[in-house]
């Protein structure tokens, strides 16, 4: 001890005295929630309420007998602060001395038991479906230990069954060991076990009534149920909700049968309280409690370590537990304090429970219950222990630590071995493994207890960094103490202390939920099985996530131990102890089992925690951020420390870099966040850190675990879980259950899953879907899929970081598998499926997975956003996540260049040589580490960065595997860096990310097909499954997953994936999370559906699995299945799938549109982003529908992905003819030619294709994309233009570079251009947001862009151009940062940037001229364009023409139109057909290389080429780079010819015309607005014509496109473009008006520059209006001006509003005073609705239906105050005098400043307006009449007259004037 015994005693006496003073006279415990009576006596609130409730009459104060009533009770906050501080002091003292105060903690424990248990019970009821079972089991447990065994196993669903038996067996023989783990080191425990048991049991019996029996049995359980406790935890969780009494009973029974019951009953009880309390706290205020609990757990952990070190410490720990219990009791009043104690308790309990089970992990929740019970028994036992073994304190500790650790390890190993024996026992293994892990952690902590004490103290005081500093010491101490026995343990200990500190910090930072999250992380880190077990419970609380993070870092540091990251760590330490040599492999097996079990547990836990998670998801997200940050830096430290001794020094070094970054990980998260500019970045960053930690280690983990995990096969279980979970919380449950199943199925996946499950759990909390789908598919292709799915899960959880982690895990695993041949990659990935197939395959899967991770992240963000209206309850967080994702992505992108390149190298190397990959990865990791995640997530990072990096890595890897693709691979590598450039601005970053994802995915698609050839079919199928899972998990992820699926299975999938990724990315950007929720929901469905799709793509590789999945998912998503059936059919035949998809889309389109609308409605305005997210799924608005009925939408999306993938994989040209594959054709062309660069375009193109086939879905996605990715699209468009340039120039490479720089230039140059282009696009986007048009528009834009680019690229030089385009796209994406990470492209970009700037300026002039010509052409063909205008909207082909900048905008418009006009619906057959036909035609034309098309030489197909010409023209117009004048003229001519020549070409022609319009008319703004106004009506009107007259639709589309091109031009030369836009718009308007008055009206409305102000809106609503205004190019101002046209008021459903200044000014000025519902409904319907229907009808003062605003607007020629002279006299409140004067002026009155200035006798009526209540002098205003001969009225006369817009009679408002004599 540091302090002398005397000093310690003195301090203890003082503290005891303070405690007595702060004790409640009734319960004799530290006062909890102190309340003071009138007589100034302080009692516990609970005690007083109990006292007051006992007597009917007036109660008396127990001390002074005065009457007291409930009303007289007052909360004593100062006293509660005293108690809180005292508890902190006690905790600190305990940490310093290892002593515990049984008194206070016993009290706390006791008191907390009842309230906390009750709360927990409620929570558990919500969170766990097994609660009743658990209760029954627990009830029967006291009667029979065997029953207990059975019940835990039942509760755990076989997780605990085997384990329970083993645990019991072990526990009974090794009861002392287990208990020793709890109380002290094994030796000490063994020595004192008997005493403890007897004394403890006796004490427990004594305390039993108070729930101490639970604790006692817990202690005994700790002894006997170390492994058992995990099983029991579930029981306890279930049981606890029932009552503390049950626990007490069980504990009493346990006491009676100390060995038997303590083993089982105690464990159950203890566990149950953990789960229950934890859940309760998570759900209820216990969130705060939990935070405290976590903190306390941390403290306890440290203390427990101390206790482990010293018997005295152990005793102290028990005392502290008692204190913790007391604190828990206090928790209700000082939640933080309780939490602190609870955290300490959880720590202690964790140590005990680590030995027991998940106690610690669950302790955060559990501690609240168990800590008190456990604390009491612990305290008493510790006290006895102290009395018995004070002398043992010093010397026995280290021995005991080691001995116990060894014993524990042996137990754990036994358990693990036993578990390994059974696949069904894997759960038990997980439990046991987690147990050992916890035990190890506990032991480590014990070993470290002294060193940790200060650290913990710091934690207690919230000094994380100090703790961090201490951690290394702890680590060293731990290593010294248990270096031989536990190599992993120190890490765990470090992790725990770090986690503890982090938890504490989190608690301080974020409050309950953050703390919960911290705890989640901590628990997750601590052990996967346990963490997952708890994670289901605690992940909601952040604790698990935190643990995960810690574990990840620790594991990384640990090397081999790292592989046992969560579960692996404990297992590893166990194995290290037992078989240090066989550590890696056995550990991996054990870990695999543990993780499997953990996953299973997790799946179960999610059921329990689902509600909790849902409720605390958002909070958890916030916490997550904190956790990750806090956790990350400490983890880094840990990593560094542990790394030194880690067997994986290389990894460690990488991580050391990462630790710096990791320690910066919090910073990194923050940095990334700032860089990204996304708030959510933090969480992703944290998750990234986690991912990094996990990822580095996960590889090890995965590598080690795969073989062992292979034995676990729970596919059917998985499926079962998945199917049930889908209905339940499709995402969450599936996540948990599927994940478990997946884990069971594949060792590696299990490992990953275990790691990710925790993360995913967190993620699941944010977007539950993510994990589930991944897991689900993991079952089929367990390893790869699970990894991907786990990745997805992790990704979902961190959404970005997790994605990285997952991505990195896969790549790293693969690489590390190769890297450290100790666990061969084959061994490491001993998946029954893909990983074993090929390391390169694995790598590609890894890459794909990382891509999936990124997509998952993006999807998760979208899902989260969508969650708001969808299944999940994290709409806000998802949004943040979305932002975070982009931020993270951006950060990743920044880092990504390196990482991506590394990844590609790695992947390539892996594909070519696994051994090579090892060094490459090491190098890459090292190089990438500066990027924090680079090593961890080179793939994921790249993927995250743009999905291009990782995707590219994948594709490059595939290419590396395949000679044909190697060049693109190399291209991809350099492109990866290009993708990295997307570091540039956040917006660009997101866009870049999207594009990169597209490029990457295209590239991936490209490479995937080779991958398949290479025998990656399994992996692809795994990827496919994963991607399905991912899709299900996240829409964005779905794209990625689709991509992966495509890679593995079919290009279609990749295409869809890319499409979705692009959309998703864009959506994420646009929505940054809102769409995520819906998208995730859709994704879930999609994921469900995707198995079938997966199957399709899987047929060759894993047909059976897909079938199984298919069956499974068909059940879950029959609709989707139905939709998916075609996909499945076209699995092998991706083309057929696309066709079916097209037909599906055709049939689905109306539904989709409707669904989109529904989704939007569901999304509502608050969830506008979600709506946009829905738009992401817009192909069939089934997206939202998917959330509900995944099948159609999922299928659509999947089909979309597959279709696209099919195009990609299948020879693009072959697929070109297919209607459904029109876009895929483009995509394929792009992909085929330039799999890397076209990837972006292709992705967009695929998006376009998908949009065409599932236009609504894609429209939604596009809408979102257009919102967030509009700039991306613009960039894409620019890239496309660049591509056009390159195509036209036939200089794909150099031109591309030029284009790249030009793109950059355009980006920089066209920031305005982007603004306009984006603006128009945004307008459409906004409309899309308001109407869903924008998204589709954007999607269309990106689609067209991609398509056009793809066509051009494919025609020109598919690979070269495509690659160049990809580069350009990536460069473009990075826009300003093109040069940053463009490796080769970078310099080119820079050079070309200058050149392109000059060229662009020249081209801008040319474009303006050409636009004028185009305008003329448009005017000539005005009717056609206007006729086609809706067509344009719905004509993806036309959009394709606009594919370049113009295309992007027009694509958006087209998509919007498609959505609006139900392009997928009515035009889906034809629109889709037309689109596809056009694509087909384009493809065929491309192939045919019509001369007309050849005009934009890159394009080779007549119709498509014409459109492409339009593209090219628009591109040149927009970029100014291309020979725009001549080309445009040519295009115009071609368009004319085509329009005149052919209907199908008409489609193309219209696209030309629109292009002309775009070029000739800056009609984009108006076009978009027009488009948005008109798209639906237009589309609906033209729907039949569109389908019947494809040409007409394209015309409309082209008209739309033209404005967009114009917008692009505007972006380049804003003024000219705007002018042209106006002119073009007018021309378009004329044609439109001819054909569509409605369109014309909307056009006119758009034509008239709109300006709006808002009044009475919340910030969220204002942001929605802002987006709406941006979409429709409406000026949004804060103050009302003369230019203002609209005043948006917050109203109720009847359009009744409050009266505000802007309300009066709007009426007085004759503005549109409309309800906020106008904005929301417009966003929902993706078009600007007529304001008439939303005009404010009344206000709360003047009547609910006085129609004042309408009257004012319609009678501006009849001013109500005409002929009046009004003097606003005196002070006015709530309204400046000048504003009041302005109001009366606007109403026709002449304003007089002074009373003396009235003009008399001129026929003007003077009126004086005053506000009597504003006058300080009571009667001052009464004398005004003395100064002038004018009536004096109140201000209400003005306000009422204005509001009603009827001059009111003065009589009512006259102020009586008092004669002057009265004064």
Curated annotation (Swiss-Prot):
Its EC number is 2.3.2.27. Phosphorylated in response to IR, UV, and various stimuli that cause checkpoint activation, probably by ATM or ATR. Phosphorylation at Ser-988 by CHEK2 regulates mitotic spindle assembly. Phosphorylation by AURKA regulates centrosomal microtubule nucleation. A zinc finger (RING-type) spans 24-65. The modification Phosphoserine is found at residues 114, 395, 398, 423, 434, 551, 694, 708, 725, 753, 840, 988, 1009, 1143, 1189, 1191, 1211, 1217-1218, 1280, 1328, 1336, 1342, 1387, 1423, 1457, 1524, 1542. One of its GO terms (cellular component) is cytoplasm. The modification N-acetylmethionine is found at residue 1. It catalyses: S-ubiquitinyl-[E2 ubiquitin-conjugating enzyme]-L-cysteine + [acceptor protein]-L-lysine = [E2 ubiquitin-conjugating enzyme]-L-cysteine + N(6)-ubiquitinyl-[acceptor protein]-L-lysine. GO terms for molecular function: DNA binding; RNA polymerase binding; transcription coactivator activity; ubiquitin-protein transferase activity; zinc ion binding. E3 ubiquitin-protein ligase that specifically mediates the formation of 'Lys-6'-linked polyubiquitin chains and plays a central role in DNA repair by facilitating cellular responses to DNA damage. It is unclear whether it also mediates the formation of other types of polyubiquitin chains. The BRCA1-BARD1 heterodimer coordinates a diverse range of cellular pathways such as DNA damage repair, ubiquitination and transcriptional regulation to maintain genomic stability. Regulates centrosomal microtubule nucleation. This is Breast cancer type 1 susceptibility protein homolog.
